[in-house]
Regions:
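N-terminal type II signal-anchor transmembrane helix
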Residues: 1-54, 95, 115
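Residue-level signature of transmembrane alpha-helical entry/exit and packing/kink sites
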Residues: 9-13, 82-83, 149-153
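Non-catalytic, structured segments within soluble enzyme domains
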Residues: 25-26, 30, 119-290
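Terminal hydrophobic membrane-targeting helix
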Residues: 32-83, 87
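Flexible, acidic/glycine-enriched loop-and-adjacent beta/alpha segments
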Residues: 45, 76-127, 185-187
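Residues immediately flanking
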Residues: 56, 64, 91-94, 176, ...
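Acidic/histidine-rich, surface-exposed loop or edge segments in extracytoplasmic proteins
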Residues: 63-73, 89, 113, 214-217, ...
Length: 290
C-alpha cells in the first residue's frame, strides 16, 4: 500500500514537472517571437533600387544610390550565372537546398567551438538566417552576439523556408547581401568591381564576388588584392569539394588575371546629370527620388 502511494506521488510529481517544463518552453517561445515581423512580402523589406539617369541612346550616365545605403540593382535569379550561385552556396551554406532554414550540424559544431574558446568564434548562419538577419532585424539587434538574437534569427529563417521556395530565398539573398564599396546585391557588385552585368561574369569573377560578403573590407580587391585572391582560392576549393567544378577548372580560374573596374561613381555628362537630378528633385521630392 505504501509502495503504491509512493509510486502515485512520483507520477504526480513527474506530471507536474513535465507540465511546468512545457509551460516554460511555451512562454519562452512566445517571448522570443513577440514583435517578429510578418513575412507576407519579404520584398517589401528589401532595399530601394538606385535611381539611374540615361541618355537618349539608353546609355547609363549616372547612378544615384539611396541615402545611407549604396548601389542596388535587383535582377532575377536566372540572370545570375550558375557559377555564382554555386560559389555562394558552397561558401555560405552547403546544405542550402536541403536544410529547413537552419543547419543543426553546423549549429552543434559552432556551439562546441564557442564553448571551448569561452567566446563566440564561429557562426553557423545559413543563407536563410543571414537573409532574416539583414532584412528583418534592426541594426541594433543584427549585431548582438546573444543567444536570444540567434534563436529569433533561427525562428525567422524557419518561417521563411516554410513560406518561400529555395530559389526565391537565394534570389533575395543575392540581391540584398553587401559586397563592400557601397555595392548591395550581385548586379551592383559586378558593376562595381568588374564594370559588367552579373550575367557576364565568368567562374573566376564569380568566385571572387562570392568570397566578399564574409568580410568586405578585409577581402576588398581594390585595397587588399592579396586577401581577395586568397579568399577566391578558398571559394574555388569549396566548389571542388561540393562537386560543382573540377580541380582543373579551379586551378585555371585561380590563375586567370582579373581586370577591375575604375572608380565607382564616375559621372558621364555631369552638367546634364545634375540638371536632370534637379528637375526630378523638384518634381518628385528628395525622398521619392532617392
Amino acid at each position: 500500500m505504501l509502495a503504491h502511494a509512493r509510486r502515485r506521488s512520483l507520477w504526480v510529481a513527474l506530471t507536474i514537472l513535465c507540465s511546468l517544463i512545457a509551460l516554460a518552453t511555451l512562454a519562452a517561445y512566445l517571448w522570443l517571437v513577440a514583435g517578429l515581423p510578418r513575412l507576407d512580402d519579404l520584398h517589401a523589406y528589401a532595399g530601394a533600387p538606385s535611381s539611374k539617369v540615361y541618355d537618349r541612346h539608353g546609355e547609363l550616365l549616372f547612378e544615384m544610390p539611396p541615402p545611407y545605403t549604396g548601389r542596388h540593382s535587383p535582377v532575377p535569379l536566372d540572370e545570375m550565372p550558375e557559377a555564382l550561385r554555386q560559389a555562394t552556396i558552397a561558401t555560405e551554406d552547403a546544405s542550402f537546398y536541403d536544410n529547413p532554414g537552419v543547419d543543426s550540424r553546423a549549429i552543434l559544431r559552432s556551439a562546441w567551438l564557442n564553448l571551448r574558446s569561452g567566446q563566440i568564434v564561429s557562426g553557423a548562419s545559413t543563407i536563410t538566417q543571414q537573409l532574416a538577419r539583414n532584412l528583418l532585424m534592426s541594426p541594433e539587434e543584427r549585431y548582438e552576439q546573444t543567444l536570444t538574437r540567434k534563436l529569433r534569427e533561427a525562428i525567422l529563417a524557419w518561417r521563411i523556408t516554410r513560406r518561400y521556395t529555395k530559389d526565391e530565398i537565394l534570389a533575395l539573398y543575392l540581391n540584398e547581401i553587401y559586397f563592400g564599396n557601397l555595392a548591395y546585391g550581385v548586379e551592383a557588385a559586378a558593376q562595381t568591381y568588374f564594370g559588367k552585368h552579373v550575367r557576364d561574369l565568368d567562374l573566376a569573377e564569380s568566385a571572387m564576388l562570392a568570397g566578399l560578403p564574409q568580410s568586405p573590407p578585409y577581402h576588398n580587391p581594390f585595397e587588399n588584392p592579396e586577401n581577395a585572391k586568397a579568399r577566391q582560392a578558398v571559394v574555388l576549393s569549396l566548389m571542388v569539394r561540393q562537386g560543382y567544378i573540377t580541380a582543373d577548372q579551379a586551378r585555371r580560374a585561380g590563375e586567370e588575371k582579373l581586370y577591375y573596374a575604375p572608380a565607382v561613381f564616375d559621372i558621364q555628362a555631369p552638367h546634364f546629370v545634375m540638371y536632370v537630378r534637379g528637375l526630378l528633385e523638384r518634381e518628385l521630392g528628395l525622398e521619392r527620388l532617392e
